[in-house]
Structure formats: structure tokens, C-alpha cells
């Protein structure tokens, strides 16, 4: 299986921040990577475009992917509401690692987070399935709009997304 590359065009309160590209590890984690890829392209009729990063914790991560409710309580995958953890072989080794947000084992949907630091305590609990390939500095810039309580000071939006 080919490791796809997707992109997110990020805005802050409607103003462009930049484009990040993300390599998906479809060779090792195909089901999870395909879910993220399809939600990036919108080919199933629903997508990340227009959704926001609702939770940003500096020195930890930026979380988004709730396109059903913009507050972090919604989740929908291309396989239905939730799907099982595919495998937990990839580690949260540092800034730029893409991982599934979940509410416990086998509760993956659409929500994801991008690490801004090494987060080894998440190893074995969250499926890491990609890495920011270009412009990790955009993700690091997003951190400036987050607080320790996970709230954001500005609206950070995925203005556009797709596959290269």
C-alpha cells in the first residue's frame, strides 16, 4: 500500500497561517490511514474541511477532527461511528506525529491530534499513523493560540484539505 500525503490549509480567525503536509503510514496502519485520507478528500460525503482545532495544549498537542460538532464531542469515521485500534506499533516520538484521539480502547472516529513534543505516555494507548512531512512550524505556531486548560484564544480552522 502506498503512503499517501495529505494537506491542511490552516487559518487563524479566517486569516491564512499556512499549509501543512502529512505523510500517512498506510503500509503499516492501512485502515486508520485510509480513514484520515478519505476525511481529508471528502470523497465519502463528509470531511475535515471547515472543522477547527478545538483543543490546543502548548508543549503537548493540537487536536481537531470534529466536523459533526465543533466542540470536540462529535466523532464519525468512514467505517461508521467508531472503529477498533488497528495496531499500536508506532511511537509518539516527537513534534509532528499524527495520532488518533480516542475515549479508550477501540474508540477511533474522526478526531486526531498532532503532537508538538515527545509524548511517550501515549504509546500503546493511541494509534500513531502519520507524521507532518512539511511545515511542522505551522503546527508549532498553532500552539501559541492554546492554553494549558486546552482552550483556544482564536479559531484555528482547516480551511481546505485534500490529497497530493
From Swiss-Prot:
Residues 7-163 form the PPIase cyclophilin-type domain. Pfam families: Pro_isomerase (PF00160). It comes from the Eukaryota. Its main location: cytoplasm. Its EC number is 5.2.1.8. GO terms for molecular function: cyclosporin A binding; peptidyl-prolyl cis-trans isomerase activity. It catalyses: [protein]-peptidylproline (omega=180) = [protein]-peptidylproline (omega=0). GO terms for biological process: protein folding. It is found in: Cytoplasm. InterPro entries: Cyclophilin-like_dom_sf, Cyclophilin-type_PPIase, Cyclophilin-type_PPIase_CS, Cyclophilin-type_PPIase_dom. Keywords: Cytoplasm, Isomerase, Rotamase. One of its GO terms (cellular component) is cytoplasm. The keyword Cytoplasm applies. PPIases accelerate the folding of proteins. It catalyzes the cis-trans isomerization of proline imidic peptide bonds in oligopeptides. It is one of six related genes or pseudogenes found in a cluster, thought to result from gene duplication, on chromosome 1. Belongs to the cyclophilin-type PPIase family. PPIase A subfamily. This is Peptidyl-prolyl cis-trans isomerase A-like 4C. It comes from Homo sapiens.
Amino acid at each position: 500500500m502506498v503512503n499517501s500525503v495529505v494537506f491542511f490549509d490552516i487559518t487563524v480567525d479566517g486569516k491564512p497561517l499556512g499549509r501543512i503536509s502529512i505523510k500517512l503510514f498506510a503500509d503499516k496502519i492501512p485502515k486508520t490511514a485510509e480513514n484520515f485520507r478519505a476525511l481529508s478528500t471528502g470523497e465519502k460525503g463528509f470531511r475535515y474541511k471547515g472543522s477547527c482545532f478545538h483543543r490546543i495544549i502548548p508543549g503537548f498537542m493540537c487536536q481537531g477532527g470534529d466536523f459533526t460538532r465543533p466542540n470536540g464531542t462529535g466523532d464519525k469515521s468512514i467505517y461508521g461511528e467508531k472503529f477498533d485500534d488497528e495496531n499500536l506499533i508506532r511511537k509518539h516520538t516527537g513534534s509532528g506525529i499524527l495520532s488518533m484521539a480516542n475515549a479508550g480502547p477501540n474508540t477511533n472516529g474522526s478526531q486526531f491530534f498532532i503532537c508538538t513534543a515527545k509524548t511517550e505516555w501515549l504509546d500503546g494507548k493511541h494509534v500513531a499513523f502519520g507524521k507532518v512531512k512539511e511545515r511542522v512550524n505551522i503546527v508549532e505556531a498553532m500552539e501559541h493560540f492554546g492554553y494549558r486548560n486546552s482552550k483556544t484564544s482564536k479559531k484555528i480552522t482547516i480551511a481546505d484539505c485534500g490529497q497530493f
